């Protein structure tokens, strides 16, 4: 295993430094810019020196009491940021927005400074972080292993201690899996809670913004900044919250059985996690997760892939040579489903949700492994679709 990445500053440490000694904090930002490229392929674009100086001057005019005053952050390169190209991991798709996505704009208004846009599985289609013409994102703990995707670069940028905060997206694991593989917090926000305006869609009805941070508290601070109803986002909801679990859950549902695909380290980590939860006084209840597994199968193998085709099929059919072959194959499958297939799947989803709600009613929270295994880069190269389906 390679040397472990150093832990960076938390949000509180960055804001405290910026408030107490602005000149020194500005020098820290300049030094950060010089050291962003660690060879991990985490970045697609990084802030130029001239723009950083403009951002430092902007920061000087803002009140130091802002919650993210002086905090550097990154965003997955499917978010629009004014003055930055948006590629979604596909150079042929790239465009230059003049307006930032609301999530980006809210972070900047809270005093944060965007220092770069991060690498991803092209069009957020993948769970390994390898389907990118900008290079496969490598895991900073061991470069033989995948970083996880699709928000690979955002997770790695936080794991390497470069930024304390990064945004990604998550429809089916794209925020949580790279967080788990890189030892950082990954928060998938509630569907509709944060505006997705200015974010390249993958599966619009399921896409959610994801937050990467070093601590759960930091992820919560960021969520407080970016959440809110957006009347211009057709998927935004004015009150998307549900009843909250207790702050310290007592009853946790765990899967009755888990397939580890021969990854003994993943199994040992899971056993250790369960033991720690029990040591903390939590009761673990083995539950039949069949409804959840069927939901996952519907998402990955059912007609929801047609939604990806609806969002991106026009570009892919016009510019097939610009698209990663595996991504092209996955999204092209969306043409195979009929309208009847879609409505049948929607009905089945609602039936399964009734079973899932009953599960939640009996327990405070679910405790599950982030992924059943952590594949090598070589395994993904040999079996890209099979390995991806295991992660999902």
Name each model feature, range by range:
Residues 2-171, 275, 280-281, 358:
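Gly/Ser-rich catalytic/binding loops embedded in alpha/beta enzyme cores
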Residues 129, 134, 169-197:
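Glycine/threonine-rich beta-strand-loop-alpha-helix active-site module
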Residues 21-27, 57, 265-287, 313-318, ...:
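Acyltransferase
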Residues 70, 109, 163, 326, ...:
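Glycine-rich, small-residue loops and helix-cap segments
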Residues 85-96, 263-264, 376-384:
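Glycine/threonine-rich flexible loop motifs
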Residues 76, 107, 219, 277, ...:
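Conserved hydrophobic/aromatic pocket- or pore-lining residues that grip, position, or stack substrates
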Residues 2-5, 68-91, 249-253, 303-353, ...:
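Short helix-loop capping/hinge segments that flank enzyme active sites or metal/cofactor-binding pockets
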Residues 188-271:
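A short helix-breaking turn/cap at a secondary-structure junction
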